[in-house]
Amino acid sequence: MNKNKIFLAKKTLQYLEKKKLRDINLKNFLSNTKVPNMNNKIDLISNINDFFDFQLKKSLVNIEKSSQRDMLFEIMMARYDILNEYRTSVKNIINYFMSRPQGVLKLIPKLIESKILIATFANINPSGIQGVIKIKIIFVVYYITLFTWFNDENESLEKTMSVLDKYLNNIEK
């Protein structure tokens, strides 16, 4: 991820700590940035998602190899920890899309890419029919758990860990 996109993601997240996504005036907001192809709020959120993926990759450099299930747990929790650093901003984004679900549809390809990244780091092959099914399962588990994260005010994310652990255990059965 290039430094201009990182700068824009951080700028957007910083803005969203205090203001709502719906209040962003794109022309003014993007006036001092050097990132091409930022045409709408979906592009801004897509860039933030890329930034979170970039942060996740950096955090997983020394991940301990273990079972796929344990690695999925560690990787997903690492992602929730990253989201937690920007909690207010992420909650603003989620709230924005709760009232505009059609916008999420435009983000699905980018969100799937993120789940493929998670699967790959967990040594899960995303190819073929089995891979597609596994990605769909990871997608569902991740977003169901995200709703727990949304309400988990504990800094250690105990509720989030518990719910994620429960769902991953159910998948194994």
Could you say what each language-model-derived stretch is?
Residues 11-18, 55-59, 93, 141-152:
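Solvent-exposed, amphipathic alpha-helical segments
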Residues 101-124, 132-143:
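Amphipathic alpha-helical packing segments from all-alpha helical-bundle domains
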Residues 57-60, 112-129, 165-169:
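Short amphipathic alpha-helical segments and their helix-coil junctions
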Residues 1-30, 35, 45-46, 50:
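Short, amphipathic alpha-helix enriched in basic
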Residues 153-161:
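Short conserved catalytic/interaction loops centered on acidic-Pro-aromatic/His motifs
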Residues 49-60, 101:
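Short, basic, alpha-helical segments at the C-terminal edge of helix-turn-helix-like DNA-binding modules
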Residues 61-92, 99:
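Hydrophobic alpha-helical connector segments
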